[in-house]
Amino acid sequence: MSTVTGAAGIGLATLAADGSVLDTWFPAPELTESGTSATSRLAVSDVPVELAALIGRDDDRRTETIAVRTVIGSLDDVAADPYDAYLRLHLLSHRLVAPHGLNAGGLFGVLTNVVWTNHGPCAIDGFEAVRARLRRRGPVTVYGVDKFPRMVDYVVPTGVRIADADRVRLGAHLAPGTTVMHEGFVNYNAGTLGASMVEGRISAGVVVGDGSDVGGGASIMGTLSGGGTHVISIGKRCLLGANSGLGISLGDDCVVEAGLYVTAGTRVTMPDSNSVKARELSGSSNLLFRRNSVSGAVEVLARDGQGIALNEDLHAN
């Protein structure tokens, strides 16, 4: 019996003057059986008409757009090159693969730092001369200088709302019913598994369950910096209060009080007055984390029943 462990896609790649890959857009990636990883350049006649019309050089940007077919033999392997990396990011944002459903390690090492503009991606070297030429076309807006572009410039998932496109990176996984407000942020290989409200930061690797609310200014620790290796997940119907923070995983129906940052090493007072480190409660359900306003101690209490209920009108996307 065949096993779906690979992926493939026909895309358009932007090459800089030195041949480096600035980006690759895969409009219709697909999962495949395992095979041999490779990227091949396609002739104009080998791609759909709507893509063929976009192939060619842009002398103002000093770039060339080419058609490619990329095959990933196994999603368990690390990305082999920029084409491979972009295909993986598209698989996540197209919701073909959930966060941690593929190997996202090593992406930074194969991707190029790019100047992202309203006229398309540009190389950093010589950009001021490029900017001058582009100004003949109209205003030049630089969205950022980064290795990861905005998701919506490549993938617009159905059933979601994103108030600020700059706040969601390509490679984010947004389930139908998800709303990302202006101060929300979702990194790559991270996101939601169901209808969720995102007004805080979902760092790389973090997964948020159905019906949960990441409050305004709330922060969920990731693994990209600081030497952390623990991958944090939040279960269903959880609430991270405004300006709260989380460094452990939560099960279902949990609440973290507004303004409270619970790290793995935070000492937490139990209902029986014993004190434990929060990491010992990681993954538990039906808990309320709060700070005692008199003693200042962080307390955890048991909660009965299900957690929060989202406003359905805000998630009918």
From Swiss-Prot:
EC number of the protein: 2.3.1.117
Pathway the protein takes part in: Amino-acid biosynthesis; L-lysine biosynthesis via DAP pathway; LL-2,6-diaminopimelate from (S)-tetrahydrodipicolinate (succinylase route): step 1/3
Catalytic activity entry: (S)-2,3,4,5-tetrahydrodipicolinate + succinyl-CoA + H2O = (S)-2-succinylamino-6-oxoheptanedioate + CoA
Effect of E199A: Loss of activity
Binding site for succinyl-CoA: R201, G216, S219, A242, E257, A258, G265, K277, R290, R291, N292, S293
A GO molecular function held by the record: magnesium ion binding
Name used for this protein in its record: 2,3,4,5-tetrahydropyridine-2,6-dicarboxylate N-succinyltransferase
Organism (species): Mycobacterium tuberculosis (strain ATCC 25618 / H37Rv)
